[in-house]
Amino acid sequence: MEGKKVLLVDTDPQGSLTISMGWQQPDELSTTLSTLMQKAMNDQPIQPGEGILHHAEGVDLIPANIELAGLEVALVNSMNREKMLKQVLDSAKREYDFILLDCMPSLGMLTINALAAADAALIPVQAQYLSAKGLEQLLQTVQKVRRQINPKLKIEGIL
């Protein structure tokens, strides 16, 4: 992806991608995905570039931390709850060639938000029985999201 502008979005409350990218204390960051989604839920404007960290290797990151777990609970009672992440990313779409969303292995509201905001899903799966069962549920969820929320969503591949 040399020469392309890439934004990584950590949608995991454990902040695994954030930590892997070198931010070892995600709970100390002033602005994270949780902050931005809370703004979207409250109809507050999100400024261009707000909450985006710049990595030395040339990719940008919207980090996550444990606050995202509480936000996921709040999403349940929110209007348009499936599209909050899409609202956050709409302002960034023009600035990037690729936006990659890293999801936790769960089918909660954050994953639904990621599928609603995505053009395509690339699904990593371990070659194990329980992973295969989880894949079956995820594929059913993708079909529902495609029917009800995001008809453009496609499965790019399963690894």
Predicted regions and their residues:
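P-loop NTP-binding core
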Residues: M1-L159
